[in-house]
Amino acid sequence: ISCSLVGSEMCIRDRYMPVYENERGTYIFNSKDLNMIEYIDQILDAGIDSLKIEGRMKTALYVATVARTYRKAIDDCKESVEKYRANMDYYKEEIAKCTYRQFTTGFYFGKTDETSQIYDSNTYIKNCTYIGIVQGHNDKGYVLLEQKNKFSVGETIEVMIPDGTNKEVIVKAIEDEDGRPMESAPHPKQMIYVDFGEEIKEGYLLRRRELR
């Protein structure tokens, strides 16, 4: 265990650190997720001109949501700090649509303390579900969708548009690849055709907001 993470200045090989366990196990290195969306102006002022979005073990929805939001925040801030600050609620709402474990600023403003870790749970917060990615269209104008999670006819789905905007559409009909109607799409990675009543471009990601 790194001593800097538990309050000591240097590591000593024969020094033991107490580890506590409950009926669900331990929560060693159970860090909150890094979130610097509220400090883009300070990052740019510091001369940083490249940010890395961590994508390992993440879904395409997570990477698309985070990368798109930071890209828009950076562009807005470079246009004017006032515009960036005025859109802060939008950035924070978008980041919160990812699956996450509370937020921290990590080591950006100095050493972390006990508030950067989670000690009583390993539960993720989930506000949106990844529905699928548009792969094409058929002759009827239905969207060919690689489905990721179950959804049903009549549900409202949110389309992520690369410019940072979102659009809500309603599932009017679902068909399998052979044209047979379906009331819901329960099988992950199934290729299906969906009628949203309007065109959705290939490559766009779809998600559903979860009620709280």
Please state what every model-predicted region is.
Residues 16-24:
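Gly-rich Lys/Arg/Thr-decorated short loops/hinges at beta-loop-alpha junctions or inter-strand turns
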Residues 129-212:
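Beta-strand/loop-dominated core regions that host nucleotide or nucleotide-derived cofactor-binding catalytic loops
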Residues 54-129:
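Anionic-ligand-binding alpha/beta catalytic cores of soluble enzymes and soluble regulatory domains
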Residues 39-40, 58, 120-121, 132-133, ...:
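Generic recognition of flexible, low-complexity loop/linker segments
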Residues 1-7, 11-12:
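Single conserved hydrophobic/aromatic residue that forms the stacking wall/gate
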Residues 24-70:
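Long hydrophobic segments that form regular secondary structure
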